[in-house]
């Protein structure tokens, strides 16, 4: 069956957006690599924002220069950028396989005028691809602003990047659709095909990778936002450190509640975020161990450690709750038994219309042959 003109228009537009998506992916992979080498247009190494060995938790910020606060250092920032690149690379491979799967399925499995648009909705809508392109563009701007040491502009850019990542992950899992409509769309996926593998196997894996990356992005956003706040107001550096950790705790708690109350309806296995939260806690513990003397001298090592451990235990407990709900408390699927077919014989019954000739209507009888013979005699 041929697709409708609107379906073909969506199909062609989707492919053009994918081409732009792949171009943006190449650029987002090139910028961090180019920014790591001197002489390529970037004035400073973006991973080393400030000298954190000079951090003083008991002083207030000083105007006209950058006051060091808690932030990711070179190894942690490099690890975060590497994780982001790997997830974006996985997403690019996913969309490539999704496009290939739709091209192959288009030859034999188009059964309605809107089949192509339904498949595209299951793989990734044009809006979702556009949000993914904006994500990769903002991470490039973030690296460029960091290389110029513009902490305020970098915090603003990363705020946009974080909001786009939040929206992208939520839309990727739920697709902003009713659950029953997604069940209908899933029935339109041809079984035992590449499209079936992409939608039901590769897509959940990519969703968990994006959740893992979102857990790290919450940490980077908290540190960037509070560093900009700390260098804008006359406050103690220790207050900025506590503010960043507590903001990260609030974001993690919010996403845990959103997951258990809403997202699990669409995808039950969402363990990637909790793993990202645990890695984020390790990123916070590294400077606490690296500059232990500074934190001990300010009598802040124990309070900061307790706050970080609260996030660690929250992620661990949430992961255990999710596993328990998946295994023990998940509703069992109803069991169906095939209905035994009986001998059904159709009979024609005359119905007299009050304002016209008699109407013939088909009836059904599942009784034995004796009843049918009696009806024929009558």
Swiss-Prot record:
Q: Where is the composition biased (Acidic residues)?
A: 363-378
Cross-referenced InterPro entries, in alphabetical order?
Herpes_glycop_M (IPR000785)
Q: Name one Pfam family in it.
A: Herpes_glycop
Record region (Disordered): 347-378
Localization per Swiss-Prot or TrEMBL? Virion membrane; Host Golgi apparatus, Host trans-Golgi network; Host endosome membrane; Host nucleus inner membrane
Keyword Hydrolase attributed: no
* Residue stretches spanning the membrane: 17-37, 85-105, 119-139, 151-171, 211-231, 240-260, 269-289, 304-324
From the Swiss-Prot or TrEMBL record, give the protein name: Envelope glycoprotein M
Tell me which species this is from.
Answer: Equine herpesvirus 2 (strain 86/87)
At the highest ranks, the source species' classification is: Viruses, Duplodnaviria, Heunggongvirae, Peploviricota, Herviviricetes
């Amino acid at each position: 069956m041929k697709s409708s003109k609107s379906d073909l228009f969506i199909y062609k537009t989707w492919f053009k957006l994918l081409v732009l998506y792949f171009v943006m992916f190449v650029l987002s992979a090139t910028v961090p690599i180019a920014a790591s080498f001197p002489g390529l247009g970037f004035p400073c190494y973006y991973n080393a924002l400030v000298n954190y060995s000079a951090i003083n938790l008991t002083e207030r910020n000083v105007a006209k220069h950058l006051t060091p606060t808690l932030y990711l250092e070179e190894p942690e920032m490099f690890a975060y950028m590497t994780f982001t690149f790997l997830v974006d690379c996985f997403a690019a491979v996913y969309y490539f396989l999704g496009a290939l799967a739709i091209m192959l399925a288009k030859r034999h499995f188009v059964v309605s005028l809107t089949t192509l648009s339904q498949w595209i909705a299951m793989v990734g809508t044009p809006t979702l691809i556009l949000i993914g392109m904006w994500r990769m563009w903002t991470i490039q701007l973030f690296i460029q602003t960091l290389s110029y040491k513009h902490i305020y502009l970098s915090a603003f850019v990363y705020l946009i990047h974080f909001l786009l990542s939040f929206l992208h992950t939520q839309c990727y899992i739920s697709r902003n659709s009713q659950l029953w409509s997604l069940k209908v769309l899933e029935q339109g996926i041809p079984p035992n095909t590449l499209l079936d593998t992409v939608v039901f196997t590769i897509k959940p894996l990519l969703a968990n990778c994006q959740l893992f990356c979102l857990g790290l992005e919450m940490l980077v956003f908290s540190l960037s936002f509070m560093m900009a706040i700390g260098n804008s107001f006359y406050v103690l550096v220790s207050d900025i450190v506590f503010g960043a950790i507590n903001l990260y705790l609030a974001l993690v708690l919010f996403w845990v509640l959103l997951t258990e109350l809403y997202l699990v309806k669409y995808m039950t296995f969402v363990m990637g975020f909790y793993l990202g939260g645990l890695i984020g806690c390790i990123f916070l513990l590294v400077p606490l161990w690296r500059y232990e003397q500074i934190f001990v001298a300010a009598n802040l090592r124990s309070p900061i450690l307790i706050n970080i451990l609260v996030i660690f235990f929250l992620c661990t407990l949430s992961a255990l709750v999710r596993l328990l709900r998946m295994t023990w408390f998940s509703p069992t699927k109803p069991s169906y038994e095939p209905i035994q077919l009986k001998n059904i014989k159709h009979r024609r019954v005359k119905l007299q219309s009050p304002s016209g000739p008699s109407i013939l209507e088909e009836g059904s009888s599942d009784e034995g042959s004796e009843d049918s013979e009696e009806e024929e005699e009558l």
